[in-house]
């Protein structure tokens, strides 16, 4: 076992002591009680759905038709297009904003800090309304795809810029000094030494932010973009089946986000 792994194991043991028999019994009891409470809540919800007729077959049988799933798959494809495009744009823009934020040029650093704080603070829904209602007033025509994708990407870029900056700050200062001492320029040091390590450090945070991007696409109804949620709203209107459709769509989104986290 390497010295690094031994040190990490020692630190983990110091922070998280293995539970003893008494603690294990408490955990088992707590788990059992929680399971019973959750089961009771689910039964109460199902009972309420049954009492109001939401479990009637007419609200569920249309999911046995291929046309329903084809329509949902079309919306799923729209969601994937927006999520991938917005994710790619936000990664590039977030990296550029981070580089500007850590720049030694003070005006550039200050400007990037303002932009980052703005995009982090403004809700993505407000940005979508801006692109949908305000931007066209200035003669700029956009498709519903870009009216949704750009705001989602901008909102995510502010968060990703800070994620990247945290990764850069996590790189040991000694490595930067060593690179500078052998004659590497600050730009080459950032590109060859700092960024590769910083990106590895923040991969879990990048995945989490991609999940947020997928969730942000659910407001596509604002711009009438045919994503998964928008097509679900059409099904609800067509079949008057709010509970069954939203339940199915929720499961689909859970599977999408689970797949992203496991990627």
Which residue stretches match the model-derived regions?
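Transmembrane alpha-helices and adjacent helix-loop boundaries
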Residues: 2-263
